[in-house]
Amino acid sequence: MMTAAAVSNLGHLPIVDGLGLEVRGDLGLNVFNSRALLLLQELGLESVTVSAELRHQQVRDLRKYIPCEAVVYGRLPLMVTENCPLRCSGQCSAGNGGVLTDRTGARFPVLCGHGCRPEIQNSRPLYLADKPEWKKCGLRWARLRLTTETAEEALDILQRYQGSDFPAPAGFTRGLFYRGVE
């Protein structure tokens, strides 16, 4: 039984209105300040994922009118494209996604969305398990955004976030959690 819907665009609110579901704000809302949290609370959202572009101090300082979560692990979306680069290059896998490789050899996973609107992911996952600051930001939840991981990798990541003595793996990013947006 479905109990909640995640909306990543304010245009989704009328679609889920009246369905009797809890409405949760997803990463696509790009919630960047306390006024946005207040507005989303007034619009009836139950919780919100804050922007991945916020520094940890900014997340901490938000007035949390509604419960907040942040992505603390995972490949963050870089862009959603109207035209599918996989289909255009003859690599379409019927919705199973693929990979774009840049001139440096970095591999960017492509997740296929509804209506063949692919989401291009960062080549490196965000990793904060070994950094205590995210635990002091007043978040209700921490989200592990598992997209391309195998079951074994997902279990390892979960154990890293539940434990206290796990060094960072190779090939990760801290995202904008420490440097923010310029």
Where are these regions (language model features)?
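Active-site pocket-lining/capping segments in soluble small-molecule metabolic enzymes
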Residues: 1-39, 43-182
